[in-house]
């Protein structure tokens, strides 16, 4: 269940509501508390851990997934997650978005790729499952720039990767930039993006689990691209195209690979 609330009591309530909803249909299911939105490691240590413990106290919850920025992960918190991972499932997901510093500066991320690599390595070194998020199609990035992200990520000790297409959202600075300078943006059609994703994963270390190809924004907020496809429909199209192309993850892997660090191994 994705958790957005900052108050510990609200965390338990949100988690309990989610478990109750799904347990009607799946009574034996276990759950991971997903601290998804915003930066879920930016607070005092005691305040953060109280929220995590509140979520874990909910019956049926067996672990945590915590999304955050690569420049907001202190060693003290990683030590907490390392100890917790000995008894619960723990994954840390970092929003990288790009491996190019010029892009990170342009989109005002406020961190460098070196900081992303450092956070990933510190996390994996503690035997914690480590994931990354990447946006494909950011302005100023060529097709080869995008595919080279796969080369760079393949050398990192990542467990999982979530890919997202660039989406223009109403009221954002990027939407204004695209309206003023459309020539600086390439908004992929669904077919173009499917082939881009497959080219990307053919250069990606096969030990990295790709958890997602696309993301979905509320229709009333989305300007473009509007493909009219749900995530599962898009994934089915990717799988079909993979079969047609006889493609496979890692077929064109370029750099020496680095195996992900997995707990218990």
What feature does the model see in each segment?
Residues 56-61, 148-163, 235, 239-246:
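Structural recognition of alpha->loop->beta junctions
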Residues 39-43, 70-73, 137-142, 168-169, ...:
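Short, small-residue-enriched loops and turns at beta-alpha junctions
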Residues 10, 47, 107-115, 141-148, ...:
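Alpha-helix N-cap and loop-to-helix initiation/capping positions
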Residues 25-113, 118-119, 124-125:
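Conserved SAM/AdoMet-binding glycine-rich loop
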Residues 160, 168-265:
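Auxiliary Fe-S-binding modules of radical SAM enzymes
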Residues 1-8, 12:
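Single conserved hydrophobic/aromatic residue that forms the stacking wall/gate
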Residues 13-23:
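A broadly used, surface-exposed interaction patch
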Residues 114-174, 191-216:
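Conserved C-terminal portion of the radical SAM core fold
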């Amino acid at each position: 269940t994705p958790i957005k609330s900052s108050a510990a009591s609200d965390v338990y309530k949100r988690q309990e509501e989610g478990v109750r909803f799904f347990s009607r249909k799946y009574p034996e299911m276990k759950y991971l508390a997903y601290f998804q939105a915003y930066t879920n490691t930016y607070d005092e240590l005691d305040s953060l851990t109280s929220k995590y413990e509140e979520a874990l106290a909910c019956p049926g919850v067996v672990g945590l997934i915590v999304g955050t920025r690569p420049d907001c992960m202190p060693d003290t918190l990683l030590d907490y997650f390392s100890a917790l991972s000995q008894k619960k499932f723990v994954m840390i997901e970092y929003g990288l978005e790009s491996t190019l510093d010029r892009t990170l500066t342009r989109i005002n991320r406020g961190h460098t790729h070196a900081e992303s690599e450092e956070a990933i390595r510190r996390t994996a070194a503690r035997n914690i499952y480590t994931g990354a998020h990447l946006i494909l199609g950011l302005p100023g990035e060529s097709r080869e720039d995008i595919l080279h992200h796969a080369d760079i990520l393949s050398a990192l000790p990542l467990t999982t990767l979530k890919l997202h297409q660039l989406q223009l959202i109403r009221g954002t600075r990027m939407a204004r930039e695209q309206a003023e300078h459309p020539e600086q943006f390439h908004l992929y059609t669904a077919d173009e993006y499917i082939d881009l994703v497959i080219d990307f994963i053919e250069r990606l270390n096969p030990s990295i689990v790709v958890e997602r190809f696309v993301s979905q924004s509320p229709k009333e907020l989305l300007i473009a691209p509007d493909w009219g496809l749900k995530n599962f429909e898009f994934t089915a199209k990717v799988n079909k195209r993979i079969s047609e192309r006889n493609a496979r993850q890692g077929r064109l892997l370029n750099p020496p690979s680095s195996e992900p660090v997995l707990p218990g191994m």
